[in-house]
Swiss-Prot record:
Keywords (A to Z) from UniProt: ATP-binding, Nucleotide-binding, Transferase, Ubl conjugation pathway
E.C. designation(s): 2.3.2.23
Membership in a protein family: Belongs to the ubiquitin-conjugating enzyme family.
Low complexity: bias regions: 310-388
Segments of this protein annotated with the region Disordered: 195-388
SMART domains: UBCc (SM00212)
Full protein name: Probable ubiquitin-conjugating enzyme E2 L709
CDD domains for the chain: UBCc_UBE2J
Length: 388
């Protein structure tokens, strides 16, 4: 079985239907080779070919519709050369703009209908010569038109491919069909329901777009509400942190007051110690005791600062407002050790005052005592000399 391209079958089916209705042209392919398509033309009205029947063949290329076909005439017409069937494969047939003689004018949009329509118009123009064309008088053409019926009645390919036409010709019942009586191809125009369907589709699409827009508006409003909630949460967190800062500031002020009172008491105690004769020994003992107390105080300060840092990290990581409020209660308790942190700073400053001021006073007191003793010794010596 021969492999036939879909385009070949389509062109044959379209040609068999449309050409017969419009021009009275019969069309049929060979059973063994669909690339050999036979046709029978009726002589056009008002021409010397009127009343005649003309058998021909179109040989399609294997790569149809990308290359033009060849066209051959089998029935003598007085206009083109006639060939005997079977036609030689080396024959190029008749020269037309739609055959292999002019491949530059061929396009893949051409089909069997365009080839045969062009051939009919060329047949009616006796002055257009070319390869395969024959010059004949009108009387010769008319005589060949009458003889064409007997030729068709003896053609075996016509009997095989067009049996109804073959019987009508041999029985004498064949009547040529006038082109004016042939029904034209009716092209269907779009009806109103199609327009209504289109409008319905457009309305559906518009409703879909409106639904999408509503969904987008809802999503936008939800996003705005979520952003507002986040802002309120952040504001509440910032307020809570501000409250914590206020608590820490209050504790700092209390620690400063206590440090001032402790410094005054230490200054008084330092002054009483400096008036004693063993000031130097007491000062060394005080310094050692103070250094020991400072070292002891610094240890809990470090621990307390670590606790505060942990509590602050916990409060920053928690987003809900309730958890932040609970962090307040936890952070207020470790604020007490912060007093010791700032008292240590104040003790350092007081240390310098202790080490400087008492030493000067002691030195001055000692110098005063020495001067007084020296003066008393001198006065005693002078009194002794006076007595002598």
């Amino acid at each position: 079985m021969q492999n036939v391209h879909k385009r070949v079958i389509k062109d044959i089916n379209d040609g068999m239907k449309n050409l017969k209705q419009e021009f009275g042209i019969y069309l049929a392919p060979e059973e063994d080779d669909f690339y050999k398509v036979h046709f029978i033309l009726q002589g056009p009205e008002g021409t010397p070919f009127e009343g005649g029947l003309y058998h021909g063949m179109i040989r399609l290329n294997n790569d149809h519709p990308f290359r033009p076909p060849n066209l051959h005439m089998i029935t003598p017409s007085g206009r083109f050369e006639a060939e005997k069937y079977p036609i030689s494969p080396n024959s190029r047939g008749i020269c037309t703009t739609a055959t292999s003689f002019h491949p530059e004018s061929w396009t893949s949009m051409n089909n069997l209908e365009t080839v045969l329509k062009g051939f009919v118009s060329l047949m009616c123009d006796p002055y257009d010569g070319g390869v395969g064309a024959v010059k004949s008088t009108d009387t010769q053409v008319k005589k060949l038109a009458q003889d064409s019926l007997t030729h068709i009645g003896n053609d075996l390919m016509v009997q095989k491919l067009f049996p109804d036409l073959y019987k009508a010709v041999n029985n004498g019942t064949f009547k040529p069909v006038k082109l004016a009586e042939l029904s034209k191809i009716v092209y269907k125009e779009p009806t109103k329901p199609i327009v209504e369907e289109k409008s319905a589709k457009t309305s559906k699409s518009s409703t879909k777009t409106s639904v999408k827009s509503k969904k987008n508006q809802k999503s936008d409003s939800e996003e705005e509400e979520n952003s507002d909630d986040d802002n309120t949460d952040s504001d509440s967190e910032s307020d809570d942190f501000r409250d914590l800062d206020d608590v820490v500031d209050d504790s700092d002020q209390e620690s400063d007051d206590e440090s001032d009172s402790s410094s005054e008491s230490e200054n008084e105690s330092g002054g009483s110690d400096d008036e004693s004769d063993d000031g130097s020994d007491d000062e060394s003992d005080d310094e050692t005791s103070e250094s020991d107390s400072e070292s002891e105080e610094e240890k809990p300060v470090k621990k307390s600062t670590r606790k505060i840092s942990k509590t602050t990290t916990k409060s920053s990581s928690t987003k809900p407002v309730k958890s932040i409020k609970s962090s307040k209660s936890t952070t207020t308790k470790p604020t007490k050790p912060t007093k010791s942190t700032k008292t240590t700073k104040s003790t350092k400053s007081t240390k310098s005052t202790k080490s400087t001021k008492p030493t000067e006073s002691t030195k001055s007191s000692r110098s005063v005592k020495t001067t007084e003793s020296s003066k008393s010794s001198k006065s005693s010596k002078s009194s002794k000399t006076g007595k002598k």
